[in-house]
């Protein structure tokens, strides 16, 4: 999948940001946090998992999603998110002075 396909969707970006911050979450919690229904959330998670960016593990009947630590794409996206958020924080600090 091309980077514009991953980052060109607002809900996928929200999923990636939330998982980067929280570590791992179940589908219902991800859906609640991005403001989407279960079916839409599952579709986005499947796209990200099929591309190797995310992975899931089963905890009983609950499916928990997280970044795939073996994926270079996942590492690059996590780095991008972290650097972007640091830049935003510095920008806010600069505006408040």
Where are the predicted features?
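A short acidic, leucine-rich amphipathic alpha-helix
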Residues: 29-32
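Short, Lys/Arg-rich nucleic-acid/phosphate-binding segment
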Residues: 58-64, 70
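Amphipathic alpha-helical dimerization/coiled-coil segments
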Residues: 69-97
């Amino acid at each position: 999948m091309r980077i514009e396909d991953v980052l060109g969707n607002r809900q996928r970006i929200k999923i990636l940001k939330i998982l980067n911050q929280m570590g791992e979450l179940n589908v219902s919690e991800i859906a609640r946090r991005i403001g989407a229904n279960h079916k839409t959330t599952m579709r986005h998670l499947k796209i990200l998992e099929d591309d190797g960016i995310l992975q899931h593990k089963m905890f009983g009947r609950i499916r928990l999603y997280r970044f795939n630590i073996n994926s270079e794409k996942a590492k690059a996206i996590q780095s991008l998110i972290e650097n972007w958020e640091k830049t935003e924080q510095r920008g806010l600090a600069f505006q408040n002075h």
